[in-house]
Amino acid sequence: MNKIRLPPDVEFHEDIRLLVYRPRGLVNKEAVNKIITVIGELETTLKEPFDRFSDTAAADAVDLNFEYIIRVSLYRRSVYGNRPPTKSAILATDSTLIHYGKVHALLTQGSPIKVRVFQDRKEAAQWLNVPIERLTPNSASSET
């Protein structure tokens, strides 16, 4: 795990096998490509599967389209292949991100990647079977 350098908006909790992604500002193709690369590197490096949590609460703009979301979803489905099941929870309140998350969930149905979109952090924590504190941003971080 220590071979992979994670971007500032990504955390990996080895003890609970959970990747947490917190995009800030604009969510665009560059941001999505970056997290896809990180997930791919972790999947290649780690021996055990891990769940994902995308917290889009700090995203204030979206520059994506359905064609791109479809391509990403089909790519992830194909690349993940027949690996063990994994969960991907997307916390979203922005209507565009909710719709894109639901498209991603639909296109990964039937694969080992189980995607659900949540508007409530507590529900996401319950589905992922992790303490809600692990999904809550650290307000004491370097945001001063």
Named regions from a protein language model:
Residues M1-T144:
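Amphipathic, Lys/Arg-enriched alpha-helical "gate/interface" segment within cytosolic domains
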